[in-house]
Amino acid sequence: MPSRLRKTRKLRGHVSHGHGRIGKHRKHPGGRGNAGGMHHHRINFDKYHPGYFGKVGMRHYHLKRNQSFCPTVNLDKLWTLVSEQTRVNAAKNKTGAAPIIDVVRSGYYKVLGKGKLPKQPVIVKAKFFSRRAEEKIKGVGGACVLVA
C-alpha cells in the first residue's frame, strides 16, 4: 500500500491522531523499556527470558590467567610481519641499515627456528628466542634484541 493512502498520512494535522480526547491514550502504561521485570512484568520475564535476573556461582578475584601465554612465530614467517616496501628496500641495498622486525608489536613473544632466512642481516626484537633461531639470525649477519 502506498504511503499516501496510509492512516498515518490521513491523520496528519489532527491533534489526537485517532486516540480520542487528550490523555485517553495514556503515555507509558507499563513503564518504559524493561521496567518492572521483577514486578508487574514478571510473568513475561520468567516465561521468555529465564535467568535474566540473579547470579550464578562465585567469582574468583585473584585468578591467575594463563601464566605460560607465549605466542610464537617461526623464522620462515618472520618477513611476513613487515611491509612489502621494507622487504623490497632490504633486498636492494644489503649494505645499508638492517631492517628492524619487532615481533612483539605483531603479537608474538617468542621466535622459533623453523625454516630459512634470506641471506641479509636483520635485527629482530622479541621477548624470547630459541637457540636455533638465534643461531640462524646471527648466521645471516643479524642481531637478536631482547625486549621486556
From Swiss-Prot:
GO CC annotation, single: cytosolic large ribosomal subunit
Post-translational modification remark: Hydroxylated on His-39 by MINA.
List of residues that carry Phosphoserine: S68
Top-rank taxon, per record: Eukaryota
Compartments reported by the entry: Cytoplasm
Sites of N6-acetyllysine modification: K47, K55, K110
Single GO molecular function: structural constituent of ribosome
GO BP terms: translation
Annotated keywords: Acetylation, Cytoplasm, Hydroxylation, Phosphoprotein, Ribonucleoprotein, Ribosomal protein
Biased composition (Basic residues): 1-30
UniProt-listed InterPro entries: Rbsml_uL15_N (IPR027386), Ribosomal_uL15 (IPR030878), Ribosomal_uL15/eL18 (IPR021131), Ribosomal_uL15/eL18_sf (IPR036227), Ribosomal_uL15_CS (IPR001196)
Pfam families: Ribosomal_L27A
Residues annotated with (3S)-3-hydroxyhistidine modification: H39
Annotated stretches, region: Disordered: 1-37
Regions that span the bilayer: none
Subunit structure: Component of the large ribosomal subunit.
Record-stated family: Belongs to the universal ribosomal protein uL15 family.
Annotated function: Component of the large ribosomal subunit. The ribosome is a large ribonucleoprotein complex responsible for the synthesis of proteins in the cell.
Protein name in the entry: Large ribosomal subunit protein uL15
Organism expressing this protein natively: Oryctolagus cuniculus
Lineage, broadest ranks: Eukaryota, Metazoa, Chordata, Craniata, Vertebrata
